[in-house]
């Protein structure tokens, strides 16, 4: 299985070492800048994952239009910001239903990729416990078009937090 992550950040420590050795960075402040630069280079960048999730979601939407699926899926249309992780997990579970019912190789591969990207981004949120949120089965059942529109909205909430 191929996972496409075009926005992976490749960092070269050699640039920092060269900068350190070729300048008069041997002061306490210079060393701090060097250390902070090295640390910031290693911090994972999850925003790119959400952009890739959004692109995969658009691809799924285009592929589904040609199949004319009529499934109904649990959909949260009014996501509260404090419940976005719980809601995203519900959307990911329902996405598996689309993959199963479509029986289309392209959709299945794109769904798997989307789920991997979303889960890797969600793992950066740690084990967040959100109380007062609806469980998946309490959500309203809607058609695929409405489901995908709501899904895009919640992905946008992760890209641009309120």
UniProtKB/Swiss-Prot annotation:
Intrachain S-S bonds: 83-133, 90-136
Glycosylated position list: 119, 127, 143
Keywords annotated in UniProt: Cytokine, Disulfide bond, Glycoprotein, Secreted, Signal
Keyword Glycoprotein recorded: yes
GO cellular component: extracellular space
A molecular function (GO) term: cytokine receptor binding
Keyword Secreted: yes
Signal peptide: 1-29
Propeptide: 30-48
Entry's Gene Ontology BP terms: immune response; interleukin-15-mediated signaling pathway; neutrophil activation; positive regulation of cytokine production; positive regulation of immune response; positive regulation of peptidyl-tyrosine phosphorylation; positive regulation of phagocytosis; positive regulation of T cell proliferation
Subcellular location as annotated: Secreted
Stored Pfam families: IL15
Role description: Cytokine that plays a major role in the development of inflammatory and protective immune responses to microbial invaders and parasites by modulating immune cells of both the innate and adaptive immune systems. Stimulates the proliferation of natural killer cells, T-cells and B-cells and promotes the secretion of several cytokines. In monocytes, induces the production of IL8 and monocyte chemotactic protein 1/CCL2, two chemokines that attract neutrophils and monocytes respectively to sites of infection.
Protein name per UniProt: Interleukin-15
Species of provenance: Marmota himalayana
